[in-house]
Amino acid sequence: MYPNLTGLGIHEPKQIERYSLRQEAHKDILKIYFRKQKGELFAKSVKFKYPRQVKSVLVSGGNNQYKEVTEINRNLTLVIDELNKITKPTPTAEVDLKQKILTDLRHLEKVVSSKIAEIEVDLEKLK
């Protein structure tokens, strides 16, 4: 019923609660969150990285100049279509660019802090 999600190793798509999609450099990051199971402290999630497709587009003006643009990976669009059938997301209002940048910055801070803590734990093991 959901061949693209099955291809990602998701065999119980009805357990999917929500998903998020963000762009980092030349990759789209899809994170799928599952319903919290009884006895679990945190809900399980999985992350997938898709490279963005790069295309050369002719710039208008007739001077044979091309510009590289990136767009979402076709496989990712198929996965998102299946996720939307499962999660039935509500349409979101247009996001304020400043707020989006601040949100991305806060996320990056958390990721970096977590990685630093992980490396420090590894260093302590070496002592």
Swiss-Prot record:
The organism's place on the tree of life at top rank: Bacteria
Phylogenetic placement of the source organism: Bacteria, Pseudomonadati, Pseudomonadota, Gammaproteobacteria, Vibrionales
Family: Belongs to the UPF0325 family.
Name under which the protein is recorded: UPF0325 protein VS_2356
Organism per entry: Vibrio atlanticus (strain LGP32) (Vibrio splendidus (strain Mel32))
